[in-house]
Each structure stands twice: as structure tokens, then as C-alpha cells.
């Protein structure tokens, strides 16, 4: 009988904010045999790669390319915690795949809780210019590692919904490699993985899984990795109902990460059932955090309107 993954939260990282120093200490203390420093940031913070598994299918993943998107880092930390309690799942998975997981690609932005790096560069739009020291680390690893799949792990704002009512707690994308958005074999391989994730999670978070727009961006990471022939799966963690700390998102992001790796281990380049990808509803940008209805303005004439508010997430000094 196949054992199912039982979600566990990593107790060492209870909060949304993750200090780079705390993360580095944790990895060195607990996974010294699996981590390697692969580069450093503009402010000379280390960038670590965690390597697990000896399978033939090679997977590259990275978290916090945008410093204020910590859910993917949490997801991998939670998955490591789960594997402590369910080692058979770990052994089964990593007998088929080899995973290189780059933790916190943007440690400078992660420390300050900013999307961009210390030079105010959005690394997800830096593929052609290569202006950021950190992105050059990722690009070199991707181009020399002979990877079969890549996982580009991000978060999205609370504005996204699947149907105008439910939030898009998770969104996925197989990025296009051209303006025509041609569905190539490389894209189909990524779509097949996303389809497996969707089928396995849609009953747990019904109407909360969406498909991100596949508009082509010539300078973005996923689009160019697809052009290189690497099937790339974009993860976007979004809002979970009544949960601005994204604890629910964290849970299902972790499960989706595992399901994605498991799907890769089983598909091994197959495009089986890739068409299911088209059944996933597209993201819609229609949500706000708060809407004040029928607000009467203090004007010389009668003016009544609705005011929509979008929250801005900030980290306060002394809090994490």
C-alpha cells in the first residue's frame, strides 16, 4: 500500500520571515553532507545548494529569487521535516531523481524583505543582461547541469482568483518560449507535471488552483529556460482564505512541491495527459483585500463610491 505524505511544519521556522543567517546556520547544522556554497550575493552573503538523491532524473529548483516570497523556502524546509518522519517517501523519491535546490537565491533581498536584490534588480527579468551577481550563479548551474526539469518557485499577490470568488492559492505555468506561445514537446513535459499536481490537489483545495498567463517575456527566467529545452514549472503561491500569514498556502505549497517531484519521478519525460493542463482555470486579477462600500465623500456635491484597498506586506523591526 502506497503511503501518503502527512504534512508537518518545520518547527525551527514558524514565521513568514526567514533570516538568511538563521537559514544558513540550520542548513550547516543539519545538512552539512548535502549542502555546497555555489556563490554569494552582492553583499557577500552565501548562496547554498542542497543536493539530495542519486536518481537519473535531474531536477533544479530555487527559492526566493524575489526576497519577499518565502513560501517556497518554507516548503522545502517543511518537506525536509516530513522526510524525517516518513523516510520511506524520501528514499523512494530520491532513488529516482537527483534534486539540486538553491535556497534563497536572493539573500540580500530576503533579509530586507524586498522583491529586488541589493542593486534594485528584479532577477526574474535579468536573463539577458545578467546584471545581478546572484542570477549569474543560477544561469551557470542551469546551463552546465544537464537538468531534465526546473522548478521556478514564486508567490503571487492576493489579487488573483480562479473564478472571481475563490482565491488562487496555487497557480502554475509552463512558460512559453516564443511570442506565439507554441506548445512544444518541452512545454508538454512541464504541462504533464502540472496536470498531475492539479489532479492530486484539486479535491483538497477545490477551485483554488489556477493557471498563470503564458504571455511571453523575452527577459524572464522560465521562458528562457524553456528555450534552452528544460521543461520548467512555475509555482506561484497565493492567498488562502482568512490567512494573511499564508500558513494554509505554506501547507499546500509543500504538498504541491512533493507532488511535483513525485510526478517528475514517475513521468520521466513523458507528456502523458498533458492536455489536462488546459482544464485548469486561468488566473483572474479581480480581488482586493478590503472594499469599502457606499463611501460618502466630503465634497461640495454628492459623491458616493466604493473604495478598494490592497495591503502592502512589511516586516517590522524586531519581528519575524
Regions found by a protein language model. Name each.
Residues 1-47:
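Short glycine- and acidic-rich boundary segments immediately preceding or forming the N-terminal edge
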Residues 35, 49, 101, 150, ...:
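Conserved beta-strand scaffold positions in the cores of enzyme catalytic domains, especially
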Residues 48-56:
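Short beta-strand-to-loop junctions in surface cap/lid or active-site-entrance loops
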Residues 52-53, 113-115, 224-230:
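Short glycine/proline-enriched loop/turn "hinge" motifs that connect secondary-structure elements
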Residues 56-58, 65, 70-207:
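Active-site/substrate-binding loop(s) of hydrolase catalytic cores
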Amino acid at each position: 500500500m502506497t503511503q501518503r505524505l502527512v504534512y508537518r511544519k518545520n518547527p525551527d521556522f514558524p514565521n513568514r520571515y526567514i533570516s538568511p543567517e538563521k537559514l544558513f546556520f540550520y542548513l550547516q547544522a543539519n545538512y552539512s553532507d548535502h549542502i555546497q556554497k555555489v556563490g554569494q550575493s552582492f553583499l557577500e552573503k552565501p548562496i547554498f545548494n542542497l543536493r539530495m538523491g542519486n536518481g537519473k532524473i535531474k531536477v533544479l529548483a530555487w527559492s526566493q529569487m524575489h526576497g519577499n516570497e518565502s513560501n517556497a523556502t518554507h516548503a522545502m524546509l517543511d518537506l525536509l521535516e516530513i522526510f524525517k518522519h516518513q523516510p520511506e517517501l524520501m528514499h523512494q523519491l530520491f532513488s529516482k531523481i537527483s534534486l539540486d535546490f538553491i535556497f534563497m537565491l536572493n539573500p540580500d533581498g530576503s533579509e530586507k524583505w524586498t522583491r529586488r536584490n541589493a542593486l534594485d534588480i528584479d532577477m526574474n527579468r535579468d536573463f539577458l543582461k545578467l546584471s545581478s551577481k546572484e542570477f549569474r550563479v543560477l544561469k551557470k548551474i542551469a546551463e552546465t547541469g544537464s537538468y531534465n526539469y526546473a522548478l521556478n518557485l514564486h508567490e503571487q499577490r492576493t489579487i488573483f482568483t480562479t473564478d472571481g470568488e475563490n482565491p488562487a492559492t496555487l497557480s502554475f505555468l509552463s512558460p512559453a518560449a516564443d511570442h506565439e506561445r507554441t506548445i512544444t514537446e518541452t512545454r508538454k513535459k512541464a504541462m504533464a507535471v502540472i496536470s498531475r499536481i492539479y489532479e492530486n490537489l484539486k479535491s483538497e483545495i477545490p477551485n483554488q488552483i489556477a493557471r498563470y498567463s503564458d504571455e511571453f517575456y523575452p527577459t524572464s527566467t522560465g521562458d528562457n529556460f524553456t528555450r534552452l529545452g528544460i521543461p520548467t514549472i512555475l509555482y506561484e503561491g497565493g492567498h488562502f482564505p482568512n490567512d494573511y500569514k499564508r500558513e494554509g498556502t505554506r501547507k499546500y505549497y509543500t504538498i504541491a512541491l512533493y507532488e511535483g517531484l513525485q510526478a517528475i519521478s514517475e513521468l520521466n519525460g513523458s507528456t502523458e495527459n498533458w492536455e489536462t493542463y488546459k482544464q485548469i482555470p486561468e488566473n483572474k486579477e479581480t480581488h482586493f483585500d478590503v472594499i469599502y462600500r457606499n463611501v460618502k465623500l466630503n465634497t461640495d456635491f454628492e459623491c458616493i463610491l466604493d473604495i478598494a484597498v490592497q495591503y502592502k506586506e512589511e516586516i517590522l523591526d524586531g519581528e519575524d
